[in-house]
């Protein structure tokens, strides 16, 4: 829908208002995820075969590859190599799901499971404080460097932290899930649709509320946070 609107307005409107142009750009932002999702799913069959052959060595090797790309990209300034991390980082995150599916993650020693979120969080803090990686895991306008373009080692340690935390809380979470099974089944059925359209809703709301003089408190204030609850 937004792609059609964008094409039509470019063809039919000579002087496109900046607000409308910006709204169309923002509404299309979530589609980056859809493209990567289709890419990862398309490569699932060969990645499963590699998983069966190499096991844990595969994600470890991919993580080393991500680090090498970061060193060459940021250290040597060879920006062309950054495209490799679009595959390595997102495929690595997806690869960990195979270990959950075949039970490998569930067979891990309890100490390893407990250590994973600690190591992941410690690594993330180190990269974003001692290292030069941005604190934001997404992209913040004005920052010279983003962790998502290209994907960086920071996203890998973030994945280790979150996956480790999920495994650590798995038993309790399964109990919660059983208690609200119908709600989870219903929301999971529409979660991708909500994700793809949520920026459109924000853009439309902004287009209506801003001209009406809706208050815009300073970023970070209590009023600013209250309007986002």
Regions flagged by a language model, labelled:
Residues 1-229:
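Alpha-helical transmembrane segments and their immediate juxtamembrane cytosolic regions
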